[in-house]
């Protein structure tokens, strides 16, 4: 959530920046609401002051044995008016808060202005895409998996529906090996604290990280007495661990990681990536979350991104880093780098990780702060998150980049020990 005071002091600048994110901020409406709010607040304070003065007068009259019935009538009149105005003020404040909750984060100054993914800017590349012989072109991961009888989309469709999969045998083992490899790399080499977190979260958590109220349609919600939803990403439970907390500044930065399933309805993705593992309702990720002080937020994004990149480098998977434009960033992000891995069957790069610096946007929603003895009052932390990596997409990238002409799949060197010595899947 944006700082209301900052908005009031920088209305035109905020409107211009929000416009680059596709959000139309009605300055006149906002100013009218603020003017009305101030009027109601001033009237409330005036009535409360009158009531306090009269209450003292009642006490004085009672001490003298004088009649106070007329004054009590005036107090009752004030109380009735206060009740009406306080409700009106509350309703108006709720409306203003809903407006604030609907606003996306303001982009950092160096974020390119653009409408969609076509306006993203390439920062760097790593690795050289493998060339396939024209007579033996690269096969799609779904075809390879089905030929090996180790990826079964039909069985998943029977059990559940579309956009699910069943992994079998050595490909299931490779999927598990990947998550273990990623966790070990981040905890042993990059200094992350590993967590096991709930896969169900409450609405407060979803508001905290920005999924609600705007993206309710993307969630899988439980029916019944519990207002719980399945997590769309481990960012939600991990980041909300610091909700309503005042952290000791000396404990920052904090680096957290967790391996979880993720569940998304893909409400806006009808007809896209219907074949294969690219876009599933259920998938797994190893999530990375940083909690930092404000002055370390932007540099922490570079560090987090490098940690996600290291996974791809260890697996020798060619990729590129893209700086997202204003129109393609997620709702809560201030600045985002996407890692895109090379997929031979599509002859292009596809997203495998999104690393975002959210500034104090989520922290303001969560009331997540930090303090040390030299600070006059607690300050909002900065939050960052990224995939390190999406396990399913990494799996399909390995299947495609390590496929052999005989239909087998070579296991990357970094994963052989996690595969119990298996170096070829066939």
From Swiss-Prot:
InterPro entries: aa-tRNA-synt_IIb, aa-tRNA-synth_II, aa-tRNA-synth_II/BPL/LPL, Ser-tRNA-ligase_type_1, Ser-tRNA-synth_1_N, SerRS_1_N_sf, SerRS_core, tRNA-bd_arm. The keyword Protein biosynthesis applies. One of its GO terms (molecular function) is serine-tRNA ligase activity. Pathway: Aminoacyl-tRNA biosynthesis; selenocysteinyl-tRNA(Sec) biosynthesis; L-seryl-tRNA(Sec) from L-serine and tRNA(Sec): step 1/1. GO terms for cellular component: cytoplasm. L-serine binds at residues 233-235, 287, 387. Its EC number is 6.1.1.11. Residues 36-66 are annotated as: Disordered. Coiled coil: none annotated. It catalyses: tRNA(Ser) + L-serine + ATP = L-seryl-tRNA(Ser) + AMP + diphosphate + H(+); tRNA(Sec) + L-serine + ATP = L-seryl-tRNA(Sec) + AMP + diphosphate + H(+). Consists of two distinct domains, a catalytic core and a N-terminal extension that is involved in tRNA binding. This is Serine--tRNA ligase. It comes from Francisella tularensis subsp. novicida (strain U112). The gene is serS.
């Amino acid at each position: 959530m944006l700082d209301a005071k900052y908005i009031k002091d920088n209305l035109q600048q905020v409107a211009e920046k929000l416009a680059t994110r596709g959000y139309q901020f009605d300055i006149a409406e906002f100013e009218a609401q603020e003017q009305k709010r101030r009027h109601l607040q001033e009237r409330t304070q005036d009535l409360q002051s009158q009531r306090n003065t009269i209450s003292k007068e009642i006490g004085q009259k009672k001490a003298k044995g004088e009649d106070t019935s007329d004054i009590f009538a005036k107090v009752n009149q004030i109380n009735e008016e206060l009740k009406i105005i306080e409700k009106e003020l509350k309703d108006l404040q709720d409306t203003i808060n809903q407006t604030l909750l609907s606003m996306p984060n303001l982009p950092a100054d160096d974020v390119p202005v653009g409408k969609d993914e076509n306006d993203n800017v390439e920062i760097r590349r790593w690795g050289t895409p493998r060339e396939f012989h024209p007579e033996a072109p690269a096969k799609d991961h779904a075809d390879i998996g089905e030929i090996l009888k180790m990826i079964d989309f039909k069985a998943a469709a029977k059990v559940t529906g579309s956009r699910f999969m069943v992994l079998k045998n050595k490909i299931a083992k490779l999927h598990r090996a990947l998550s273990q490899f990623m966790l070990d790399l981040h905890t042993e080499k990059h200094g992350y604290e590993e967590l096991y977190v709930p896969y169900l979260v409450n609405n407060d958590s979803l508001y905290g990280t920005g999924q609600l109220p705007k993206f309710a349609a993307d969630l899988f919600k439980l029916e019944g007495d519990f207002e719980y939803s399945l997590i769309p990403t481990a960012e939600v439970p991990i980041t909300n661990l610091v909700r309503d907390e005042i952290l000791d500044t000396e404990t920052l930065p904090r680096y957290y990681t967790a391996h979880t399933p993720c569940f998304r309805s893909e409400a806006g993705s009808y007809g896209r990536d219907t074949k294969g593992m690219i876009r599933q309702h259920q998938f797994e990720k190893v999530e990375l979350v940083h909690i930092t002080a404000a002055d370390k937020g932007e540099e922490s994004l570079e560090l987090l991104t490098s940690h996600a990149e290291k996974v791809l480098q260890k697996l020798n998977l060619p990729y590129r880093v893209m700086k997202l434009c204003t129109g393609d960033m997620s709702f809560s992000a201030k600045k985002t780098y996407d890692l895109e891995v090379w997929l031979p069957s599509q002859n292009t790069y596809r997203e495998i990780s999104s690393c975002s610096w959210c500034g104090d946007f989520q922290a303001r929603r969560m009331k997540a702060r930090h303090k040390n003895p030299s600070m006059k009052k607690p300050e909002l932390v900065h939050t960052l998150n990224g995939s390190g990596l999406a396990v399913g997409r990494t799996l399909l990238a390995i299947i495609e980049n390590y496929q052999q002409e005989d239909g087998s799949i070579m296991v990357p060197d970094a994963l052989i020990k996690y595969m119990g010595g298996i170096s070829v899947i066939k």
